[in-house]
C-alpha cells in the first residue's frame, strides 16, 4: 500500500489555516490530492475535512478531552493538570498538545516517523475498540501515536480526534479541489457526491476513471443520497401557478426527514444530515421490514412523534429519540413514532431518480403496505386552488406544518433546492439561522456565551449574512450546553465578542422583520427569541437571505391590508 508521511498532511493543515482565500485553499488541497497514492485516496479527503469517517458511517472514535489529555500525558511525561491549565490559557487543546510534545521527557529508541496509513489505522482500532477494557485500549493506541508525533503533528491529530479542525475547508472547496487535481468537471464531481455522499470514493473514481467514470456513478444501497430540497411559496395559489396545470400536494409533517435503505432484512435509516440513526429507532426498522414488500429499496419519509389522540408532537421529540443510545425500550413507550413515506429513489436494482414524481409515487404505493407505524404521506393531486386550500386548512387543523407542492413531472434532484418542490407554511414562521458569533456574559454568566449573532445563508456567495442577535429564550442549562458546543468553534474575536465557525443551526422566533442598515443583509429581526437547536439541519440548509426578503414582503403586504 502506498503511503505518505503524516507531517505532509500536518503541513497542509497549517497552510490552510494561514489563508482565508478559497482559491488558495482549493489549490493547496488539489496539489495534495495529486500526490496522494491511490490506496490513500478514499481516506485523505475525510482527513482533510478533519473527519475520520463519512457522516453516515456508524463508527466513531468515542474519545473525549479527558482521555486525550491522559494519552498525551502518558506519551510525554507532562502532568495532566499542566496540560489542562495550558488548555485554559490557549483555549485550544491542539495547541496545548503541541506544547506538551515540545516538553517530551524522553524519546523512544524505536520511534519512527508517523505515516498517514499508521495514523488512520490507529483511528480505526480506536473506533472498533469495544467492551470491557476498551477505554484502556483506546488510551494505549492514542499514546503510541503521540509518542512518535512531532508537536505540529500532535496538534492536528488531537483536533481530528475531537472533531475540532479549523482549516476552513468545507464540501465546496473539496469538490473544486478534486476537479482541479484530476482535471475533471466540477459538476460531475458534485453529481457523483450527491448520489453517494462519499468524497473518498468520488476522488478515487475521478483520478482513475475521469469524467467517464464520474458520469457512470450511480446510487448504492448503504450510501445515502443527498436530499432534494424545496423552496418556499407564499400561498397555495402561488404554488399551483408555479407548478402549471396540476400538482401533487402533500402534508408537510413537523418531524425529522429520513432516508431508508433496505437490502433484504438489513435496514439502515439515515437522518437529514445523513447520520445513521438505525439503532435508536428499532420499532421503525420492524415497521419497514413488515411494510416494504420489495427486496431492495431506498425510500424517503418524515418521522413524526405521535402524541395524545394521534396529534403530532414537535420535531424535537424525534431528535430526542435519535440521541438516545440506552434504555431505548423505555423511549419507545414515551415517544412513539410514525413514519410517513413520500418518495422512492431505488427499487430492486432500478434507480428511480430520473423517473417523474407521478410514477415514483405510483411505485411507492405499489411496494408499500401501510401499517400502524408506517403510512404513505397524505396526498392530493388537483388543478383546483379551492381543493388545495381546503387540504392546507385540514393539515394545519391536524397540527401539521403546512403543505408540500410537487410538480408531477419532476425528477429527483439530489442536493438541489429548486422550484419543482415548494413548501407552503403560515407567513410569520420561525426561521432556522446559523450562529456566527457570540458574546461572553457578565457577572455570574461571565464564563458563558450569551448573546448570539445569527445569520441567513446566501446560496450565491456561499456566505452567512447576519440578521440579528439572539439573547432571550435560553435557560441556564441551554447556555452551558451552547458554550460547550461553540467553544471549539471559536475562530477569532475581539474583546467580549467571539467569531464562531458557522456550524450550528438554531430555530428563532421574532416579532417582525425590519429593514436595517446595521447588517449588510439589509434586514434585522425585531425581538428575536431562541426556540430550539436544529441538529437535523446543516448550515447550508438554514433559511436563505432570499427567504427573509420574501417574508418581509409578505409582512408588509399583510400590514397594508389591515
From Swiss-Prot:
Activity relative to temperature: Optimum temperature is 80 degrees Celsius.
GO biological process, one term: DNA recombination
pH dependence: Optimum pH is 7.5.
Cofactor: how and how many bound: Not stimulated by Ca(2+), Mn(2+) and Ni(2+).
Membership in a protein family: Belongs to the ATP-dependent DNA ligase family.
Reported function: DNA ligase that seals nicks in double-stranded DNA during DNA replication, DNA recombination and DNA repair. Can use both ATP and NAD(+), but NAD(+) may be a preferred nucleotide cofactor.
Keyword Metal-binding in annotation: yes
EC numbers, comma separated: 6.5.1.6
CDD domains on file: Adenylation_DNA_ligase_Arch_LigB, OBF_DNA_ligase_Arch_LigB
Taxon lineage: Archaea, Methanobacteriati, Methanobacteriota, Thermococci, Thermococcales
Disulphide connectivity of cysteines: none
Organism name: Thermococcus onnurineus (strain NA1)
SUPFAM superfamilies in the record: ATP-dependent DNA ligase DNA-binding domain, DNA ligase/mRNA capping enzyme, catalytic domain, Nucleic acid-binding proteins
Keywords on record: ATP-binding, Cell cycle, Cell division, DNA damage, DNA recombination, DNA repair, DNA replication, Ligase, Magnesium, Metal-binding, NAD, Nucleotide-binding, Zinc
Pfam families according to UniProt: DNA_ligase_A_C, DNA_ligase_A_M, DNA_ligase_A_N
Catalytic activity: ATP + (deoxyribonucleotide)n-3'-hydroxyl + 5'-phospho-(deoxyribonucleotide)m = (deoxyribonucleotide)n+m + AMP + diphosphate; NAD(+) + (deoxyribonucleotide)n-3'-hydroxyl + 5'-phospho-(deoxyribonucleotide)m = (deoxyribonucleotide)n+m + AMP + beta-nicotinamide D-nucleotide
InterPro entries noted in UniProt: ATP-dep_DNA_ligase (IPR050191), DNA_ligae_ATP-dep_bac/arc (IPR022865), DNA_ligase_ATP-dep (IPR000977), DNA_ligase_ATP-dep_C (IPR012309), DNA_ligase_ATP-dep_cent (IPR012310), DNA_ligase_ATP-dep_CS (IPR016059), DNA_ligase_ATP-dep_N (IPR012308), DNA_ligase_N_sf (IPR036599)
Superkingdom: Archaea
Name used for this protein in its record: DNA ligase
Sites where the protein binds ATP: 250, 257, 272, 302, 342, 417, 423
Catalytic site positions: 252
Amino acid at each position: 500500500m502506498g503511503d505518505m508521511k503524516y507531517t505532509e498532511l500536518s503541513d497542509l493543515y497549517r497552510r490552510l489555516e494561514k489563508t482565508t482565500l478559497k482559491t488558495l485553499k482549493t489549490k493547496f488541497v488539489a496539489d495534495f490530492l495529486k500526490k496522494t497514492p491511490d490506496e490513500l485516496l478514499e481516506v485523505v479527503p475525510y482527513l482533510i475535512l478533519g473527519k475520520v469517517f463519512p457522516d453516515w458511517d456508524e463508527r466513531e472514535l468515542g474519545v473525549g478531552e479527558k482521555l486525550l489529555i491522559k494519552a498525551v500525558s502518558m506519551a510525554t511525561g507532562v502532568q495532566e493538570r499542566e496540560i489542562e491549565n495550558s488548555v485554559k490559557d490557549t483555549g485550544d487543546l491542539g495547541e496545548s498538545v503541541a506544547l506538551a510534545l515540545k516538553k517530551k521527557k524522553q524519546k523512544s529508541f524505536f520511534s519512527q516517523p508517523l505515516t498517514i496509513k499508521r495514523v488512520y489505522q490507529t483511528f480505526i482500532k480506536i473506533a472498533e475498540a469495544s467492551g470491557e477494557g476498551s477505554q484502556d485500549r483506546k488510551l494505549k493506541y492514542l499514546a503510541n501515536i503521540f509518542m512518535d508525533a512531532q508537536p505540529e503533528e500532535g496538534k492536528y491529530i488531537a483536533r481530528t480526534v475531537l472533531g475540532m479542525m479549523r482549516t476552513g475547508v468545507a464540501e465546496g472547496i473539496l469538490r473544486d479541489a478534486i476537479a482541479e487535481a484530476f482535471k475533471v468537471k466540477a459538476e460531475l464531481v458534485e453529481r457523483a457526491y450527491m448520489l453517494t455522499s462519499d468524497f473518498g470514493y468520488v476522488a478515487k473514481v475521478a483520478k482513475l476513471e475521469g469524467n467517464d467514470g464520474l458520469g457512470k456513478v450511480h446510487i448504492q444501497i448503504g450510501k445515502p443520497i443527498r436530499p432534494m430540497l424545496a423552496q418556499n411559496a407564499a400561498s397555495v395559489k402561488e404554488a399551483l401557478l408555479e407548478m402549471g396545470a396540476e400538482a401533487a400536494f402533500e402534508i408537510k409533517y413537523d418531524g425529522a426527514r429520513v432516508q431508508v435503505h433496505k437490502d433484504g432484512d438489513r435496514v439502515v435509516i439515515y437522518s437529514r444530515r445523513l447520520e445513521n440513526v438505525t439503532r435508536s429507532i428499532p420499532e421503525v426498522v420492524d415497521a419497514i421490514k413488515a411494510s416494504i414488500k420489495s427486496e431492495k429499496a431506498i425510500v424517503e419519509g418524515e418521522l413524526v412523534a405521535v402524541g395524545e389522540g394521534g396529534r403530532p408532537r414537535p420535531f424535537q421529540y424525534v431528535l430526542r429519540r435519535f440521541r438516545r443510545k440506552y434504555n431505548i425500550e423505555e423511549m419507545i413507550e414515551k415517544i412513539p413514532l410514525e413514519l410517513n413515506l413520500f418518495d422512492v429513489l431505488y427499487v430492486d436494482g432500478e434507480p428511480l431518480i430520473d423517473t417523474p414524481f407521478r410514477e415514483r409515487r405510483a411505485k411507492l404505493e405499489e411496494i408499500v403496505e401501510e401499517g400502524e407505524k408506517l403510512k404513505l404521506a397524505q396526498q392530493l393531486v388537483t388543478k383546483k386552488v379551492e381543493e388545495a386550500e381546503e387540504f392546507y386548512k385540514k393539515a394545519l387543523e391536524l397540527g401539521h406544518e403546512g403543505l408540500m407542492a410537487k410538480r408531477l413531472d419532476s425528477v429527483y434532484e439530489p442536493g438541489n433546492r429548486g422550484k419543482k418542490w415548494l413548501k407552503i407554511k403560515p407567513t410569520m414562521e420561525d426561521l432556522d439561522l446559523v450562529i456566527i458569533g457570540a458574546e461572553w456574559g457578565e457577572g455570574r454568566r461571565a464564563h458563558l456565551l450569551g448573546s448570539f449573532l445569527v445569520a441567513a445563508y446566501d446560496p450565491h456567495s456561499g456566505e452567512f449574512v447576519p440578521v440579528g442577535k439572539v439573547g432571550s429564550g435560553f435557560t441556564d442549562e441551554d447556555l452551558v450546553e451552547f458554550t460547550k458546543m461553540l467553544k471549539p468553534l471559536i475562530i477569532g474575536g475581539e474583546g467580549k465578542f467571539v467569531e464562531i465557525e458557522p456550524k450550528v443551526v438554531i430555530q428563532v422566533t421574532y416579532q417582525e422583520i425590519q429593514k436595517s442598515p446595521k447588517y449588510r443583509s439589509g434586514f434585522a429581526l425585531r425581538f428575536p427569541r431562541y426556540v430550539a437547536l436544529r441538529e437535523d439541519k446543516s448550515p447550508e440548509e438554514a433559511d436563505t437571505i432570499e427567504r427573509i426578503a420574501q417574508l418581509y414582503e409578505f409582512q408588509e403586504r399583510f400590514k397594508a391590508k389591515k
